[in-house]
Amino acid sequence: MAHINCTQATEFILVGLTDHQELKMPLFVLFLSIYLFTVVGNLGLILLIRADTSLNTPMYFFLSNLAFVDFCYSSVITPKMLGNFLYKQNVISFDACATQLGCFLTFMISESLLLASMAYDRYVAICNPLLYMVVMTPGICIQLVAVPYSYSFLMALFHTILTFRLSYCHSNIVNHFYCDDMPLLRLTCSDTRFKQLWIFACAGIMFISSLLIVFVSYMFIISAILRMHSAEGRQKAFSTCGSHMLAVTIFYGTLIFMYLQPSSSHALDTDKMASVFYTVIIPMLNPLIYSLQNKEVKEALKKIIINKN
């Protein structure tokens, strides 16, 4: 391949969600409110689980880690996105862009794998209740969280290094509100075929394997629930798993739409709307999904409020 002489970009300009000035301030207020709700909801859930001894179980250990990932996930993206509404040009340095992409990928992959760990936890709890505390020991729980974090960090690091070893000389204007792969690849003057193949392969393998764990776990769970003689037991099992199923459907559904589609149909404006959903909306929704239908969380919150009063 012939060498292309070009000046390497040292910074990028994030276009943001809209160019319409009249929309920027209302959107700033809206997304700031959502972000504050996300921070309060997720950190509040973590503190509640830590404060109430009745919630010191494997299920809530995983839930507190999911809340932590959601908090970090949103915090990597939203503050910079809010800057898009306040500044004429939202500039991000080359290194900061790489850091944002790496952190974003770390927490996105972590969330995907944590949802699979939580599905396995629910499988053991419902299908083998007598062995639950024997199987889900503190050591096993830590491993089911540590492995996703470690794997996610290594994958994100390799992925980010591949992206930022490319030459960026066509333009430095990123048609997005954060540093993401597809908008960045459109700016490079390097051959991106290997990189695009890597994105598709990694996303496909990770999503399919984690979804397979979730699917198989829930096949056994549903089978076990249908065999229960107690209507109350069935209702409790369904309510416990229903929250997780809803969170899984929303998260994986959005990511499949985003990453497992042909590049020819990869419209960046459509991707921006999907990205808002899974980087801003989902981290806000998860505390609500897992709390509103959970009697134990609501009881723990009531106890804290009563004790303070």
UniProtKB/Swiss-Prot annotation:
GO cellular component: plasma membrane
PROSITE patterns from the UniProt entry: G_PROTEIN_RECEP_F1_1 (PS00237), G_PROTEIN_RECEP_F1_2 (PS50262)
InterPro entries (UniProt xref): GPCR_Rhodpsn (IPR000276), GPCR_Rhodpsn_7TM (IPR017452), Olfact_rcpt (IPR000725)
Source superkingdom: Eukaryota
UniProt keyword annotation of Transport present: no
Localization per record: Cell membrane
Transmembrane segment boundaries: 26-46, 55-75, 100-120, 140-160, 198-217, 238-258, 272-292
Positions in the Cytoplasmic compartment: 47-54, 121-139, 218-237, 293-309
MF terms (GO), sorted A to Z: G protein-coupled receptor activity; olfactory receptor activity
Family of this protein: Belongs to the G-protein coupled receptor 1 family.
PANTHER family: OLFACTORY RECEPTOR
Summary of the function given for this chain in its UniProt record: Odorant receptor.
Protein name: Olfactory receptor 8U1
Naturally occurring in which organism (per UniProt): Homo sapiens
